[in-house]
Amino acid sequence: MSGVDMLHGPLLLKILWFSLPLAASSLLEQLFNSVDIAVVGHFVGSNALAAVGSNAPVIGLLINLFMGISMGANAVISTLIGQRDHTRIRHAVSTVAVVALVSGFALTVLGTSLARPILSAMSTPPEVLDMAILYLRIYFLGMPFFMIYVFGAAILRSKGDTRRPLYILFVAGIANTLLNLLFVLVFHMGVEGVAISTSIANALSAFLMVRLLRREEVPFRLDFHNLHVDRRELLRMLKIGVPAGLQGMVFSVSNVVVQSQINTFGADAVAGSSAALNFEYYCYFIIQAFNGAAISFIAQNYGAGLMQRVRRVFWICMIASVIFCGMMNGIFACFSPFFLRIFSSSEAIIPYGVTRMHLVLAFQWIACSYEISASALRGMGRSLLPALLTVVGTCLLRMVWVFAVCPVWPGFHRLMLVYPLSWVLTGVMVVAAYVRFMKKAGDAPLAVR
């Protein structure tokens, strides 16, 4: 099955053809997660909902480094496709497979061993702490399978194939939902049932991804008899992926700090914020889809030396992400009470969820500015600068806000203001960095190796 030709012809329809299945994959995954949370909220209780929801920033903190490396793998293989270097593509695919396995087992060890200390340090409400720890430990037992799917999808997306990862995710998501209903409604399990169903679904997605890659054409075929780590390709992946991953980790640290402050408002605030966060994920996945398009399209065209196409890709991804994300932001924010009641019948959580959706979700489209700009720079092999700027503009500001502003200007609604403020600051800095780099590059790529 061929992917999208990123080097020739009109770009808009090809970017949409690439991005929409990618967005559908993430949205579908979040939809299944939302079903899990809705089942927990309605049939187990608001404390269980808070236990599952409070783990979101912790999971992000632990997996973001490796997700960044998968982004580096995508960029490296895409660049090699642009350079038509099939030998190095084959070495890169083998390297990605090994990195996926190592990453998965490392995450299992980290997640299971650090669950209690991290959640305790976050001031997780005592009534939900044990449930949150149990959920997190079971969830991370499935990390090796999750990483196999993530890195396998990165290989396919580097050549423009975003449809088959969607099909795999659909099958695994259906299995996840059915198992979740079975464990919670039939076997009367709590958060552990949701976590077990997720791990089983991850195992299914890993099996399907490996089966697919084993049947790919050379140089993208996964060959178990020739698995090895190519030092050159690994270093290139790490050069792009580690700064992006560290950015994501620091980003998650700032979210953990904000979550810790949310926890001080009580279980209802945690549950309401967690319910609202689901809709932020839906909108963010739209941005992520165009991020993926920007990295793959720009990396291939940069590798081929087509700088004018690089510029066109950037603007198409930027404008499209703002339009699609902004539309979803508006729909969710305007009908926030209705959407929040999908996740819980408790009226006590609604005011907190509405506040978050009006002050955070409604302005999420601003984040497109730095997300697309950073992805464009990473597609051209420049990952450190956008990572540093994002750390300063987003993460540092959020921590200063929590520790310096909130004590003298308390309130849940004032805490939420830190999100749009940090997006504006980071957007200005990262867009400026992209413009400066492109002026320096002119019409010739800089140091493509």
Feature map (PLM): residue ranges:
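Residue-level signal for short hydrophobic patches within transmembrane helices
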Residues: 8, 12-31, 35, 58-65, ...
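Alpha-helical transmembrane segments of multipass membrane proteins
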Residues: 34-37, 109, 117, 151-155, ...
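Small-residue-rich hydrophobic transmembrane alpha-helices
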Residues: 49-109, 146-165, 259, 272-336, ...
